[in-house]
Amino acid sequence: YAATDSGRFDGTAVITPRSGAVCLRAELPAGVLQNAVAALPWTMAREEKLFMNGYQTWTACPELGKWDRQHGVERVPKFLLEKYSFDRYGDYHFVPYSGKRGQSHGFSYCYFRRGKTYRLLASLDEAPGYTIFSYDSRAAQLRIERDCAGVQHTGGSFPAFSLFFAEGTEDEVFDAWFAALGCRPRTTRRLAGYSSWYNRYQNIDEASIQEDLNGCK
């Protein structure tokens, strides 16, 4: 469903792990968007692993078991939070963490992995707002939400979700997603990069950077 402060749209669609590209639109009256939500029945085997992509890939996002807990920053000592502001790097201040087993969330894409078989669910368009995936193992439900609350809608068709579903090996599902996005590698040559941040943080000057660059030769 999706809604503005002037009215609501409810609809259904048939979706499977092999559906490929799926576009869900909602006819809404003009007004301020309140939400856009889709709920899918989605079972997870006990031996499967779940990956939820962290907010802008900054939030901690390990693979989780079916009944694992997704942690925020509650285990980080308060003095470290105050000194380094670790709680500002991710979504910890605007997405609730239940702390319950089997409940997790992430942004833009997620996958369920059973051995070498992946079920990928991913967004094809984040322009209308971030796509937030949430999974509840106990309810066997995958919730998809568009971060669009507060946006003015002029009325008519709203692109609630533009999604991609694929099942196969890791290379198969991600290559298919990138192809659907029109994302092509700029080169097939292996590339390397350098950043001073994780070695020196803000303590940099010309001499320290030159030392690092000399070490890369």
For every predicted segment, state its role.
Residues 1-217:
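Carbohydrate-recognition beta-sandwich/jelly-roll modules
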